[in-house]
Amino acid sequence: MKKIFTKSIITTLVCSMLVLTAAGCSNGTNAESSSSTPTETQATQAQTTAPEEVNFSLDALHAPLENPADPFAGYWRIAEGAGSKLESFTFLFNGKGGASIIVGNMGYCGKYSVGTDESTGEETFKCQLMFGINGEYSYTVAEDGKKITITNNGEDSVLEKVDNPTFVPSAPEKPQIDEKLVGAWDSGTGLYYYFGEDGRMYCNSYGTTFTYFTYNTKLNKVTAVYDMDGEQTDTYDYTFDGNDLVFDGMKYTQITPEKMLSAIQSY
């Protein structure tokens, strides 16, 4: 029964993405509640210090920033209470206003903010995700920072910190790779691909979703494997037009991995 429930949630997640392409993994300062009113409280985003320049790392591409002013920064799961049926999903709060719900190797992006209710002085947490955590909450943080209880309309959800999330796949053994593909590619319209020489691949679609894969190439085809509540396999045709890549019918220009990282972090 739990498996059927989870699959229905995932199906709805995929369908919902068709109408949420404008949401993005934003650094915006406010996450709107699903139903706002004129008396809605105002949250101010916790300030972070400017991040240091970092080298590109596929494993750390979506790693959250350390932010002492933001107790939500990190990876979490719903351990108890409302939404606990989604306990296999990982929730990522990146320390600068970007939220993601991660299913297997796929992430679906939204926004969040932490602040203070101007009328009551109560600490508030706003989050805009499709499932599990969506709305405006009061919250309390455990002494060790490993659990946060969020409350909305009298319903509690207990978030438990995840120290070692596993949504990035391990590199496959002896992958068959076309060396011309290796590197980062930009469509110029918000689609980014990265092909690693270790047989791992990454896609970011308009800042609304991201997916990690393992892949092989043969006869101008990429076979990409990823997990979303079970193993999925996609096949893509590709060719080259001069220095440009034509992948699945769309043209891409090669950029540095660091430039792709900068673009993704700007959402």
Question: Where do the language-model regions lie?
Answer:
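Sec-dependent bacterial lipoprotein signal peptides
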Residues: 1-23
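Bacterial lipoprotein signal-peptidase II cleavage site
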Residues: 23-35
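Post-signal peptide N-terminal segment of mature Sec-exported envelope proteins
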Residues: 33-68
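N-terminal helix-cap/turn-to-beta initiation motif at the start of protein domains
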Residues: 56-77, 164-186, 267
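N-terminal glycine/threonine-rich, aromatic-flanked beta-hairpin/loop signature
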Residues: 82-133, 187-231
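Short, exposed beta-strand-loop hairpins at the edges of beta-sheets
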Residues: 146-158, 241-253
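Short, low-complexity, Pro/Ser/Thr/Gly-rich segments in the mature regions of secreted, periplasmic
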Residues: 258-267
